[in-house]
C-alpha cells in the first residue's frame, strides 16, 4: 500500500467524520432551538388566555352574585379589568417581540407599549394598595369603616388609581423626559428599548412599586396583628361561655329547673362578619404577596440596571422577569378560586350557567334544524299526492 495514498485516505476520512459531526451538532442545535421556541410560544399564549378568561370570570361572577357586591370587590373588579387590559394591550407586543425576534411596529407604537406597560403595572399595585387600606379599616377600625369606606369614597379612590399613573407613564414617555438625549437621537425603528435616565428610574419605581409596597406591608402587618388579637379574644370568650354554661347547668340540675342557654342573633352576626372579614383579608394578603413575588425581581433589575451603567443582564433573564410579572395577571383568579369559598362557588355557578346556556342553545339550534328538515320534506311530499288527486279528478 502506498503510504502517501494511505495518509490521504485517512485524512479524508477524518475530515468527513468532522464534517458529519458538525452537521449532526447543527441539526441537534436547530431541533432543540425549534422545540424551545414552540414551547415558549405555547407558554406565553397560555398566560395571555388565562389572564383574559380568568379575569372575565371574576367580573361576570361579581356582577351576577349579589353576595359578592361589596365595596372591597369594587377594587377587585377594577383590578381584574386592569389585568385584562394588560393581557390584551401589553402582552401581545412582548409576545410579538419573542415570536419575530425583533420590533416591527415603529417608534410610536413602541412608546405606546412602554407607556402602557408602566401604566398598568402601576395601576395594579395601586389597586392592591386601595384594597389593603379597605381591609385595614374593616378589621382594625371596624366602627369607622361604614363612615370612611362609602361607595363615594371607593369611586374616588378608583379614579385616583386610574388617573395618577398617567403622570409617570404616557406623559413623560411621549414627551421624551424618561430617557437621555443620546438615546433619542440613536433610536431605530426595528428596536424597542426602554432605556431610562436615573431620575426617572428612581421616581417611577418609587411611585409604581416601592412606596405602595411599603404601605401594603405595614397595613397588612397591622391587619394580621389585630386579627390575631380578635381571634384570641374570641377563643377566650368562647371558653368563658362554656364554663358559664356548664356552671349554670349544674345549678339548674340542683334546683330542678330548666335552663336554656341561647346566644343572641346580634353576636352570631358579628361573629360571622368578623370571620368573613378575616378570610377576605387572608385572601387579599395572599394576592398582595403573589404580586410582590412576581414583580420584585423585575423592579430590582430595573433599578439596578438603570443606576449602574456597567450592569448588564442576559436577555433570557430579562424575558423571564417580564413574563413572571405578566403571569401575576393570570394568577389572581386562581387565588380567588382556591382561597375564597364565595368566589369559588360563584365561579362554579357562572361556569355552569354558561355551559348550560351553550348546551341549550346548541339543542335549540338542533331542534330548529330538525323542524326545518321536517318542513322541507313535507313540502316535497305535498305536490305528489295533490298532483295524483288532480290527475284522478281529470280522469
Swiss-Prot record:
Intervals, Extracellular compartment: 1-42, 96-117, 176-202, 304-315
Transmembrane intervals: 43-63, 75-95, 118-140, 155-175, 203-223, 283-303, 316-336
Cellular location(s): Cell membrane
GO biological process, one term: positive regulation of MAPK cascade
Record Pfam families: 7tm_1
Cited PROSITE patterns: G_PROTEIN_RECEP_F1_1, G_PROTEIN_RECEP_F1_2
Gene3D superfamilies recorded: Rhodopsin 7-helix transmembrane proteins
A GO molecular function held by the record: octopamine receptor activity
Positions annotated as glycosylated: 5, 12, 24, 114
Topological relation to the membrane, as annotated: Multi-pass membrane protein
Record's keyword annotation contains Phosphoprotein: no
UniProt keyword terms in alphabetical order: Cell membrane, G-protein coupled receptor, Glycoprotein, Membrane, Receptor, Transducer, Transmembrane, Transmembrane helix
SUPFAM superfamilies in the cross-refs: Family A G protein-coupled receptor-like
Function description: Autoreceptor for octopamine, which is a neurotransmitter, neurohormone, and neuromodulator in invertebrates. Also acts as a receptor for tyramine, but with much less potency. The activity of this receptor is mediated by G proteins which activate adenylyl cyclase.
Recorded family membership: Belongs to the G-protein coupled receptor 1 family.
Protein name: Octopamine receptor beta-2R
Biological source species: Chilo suppressalis (Asiatic rice borer moth)
Gene: OA2B2
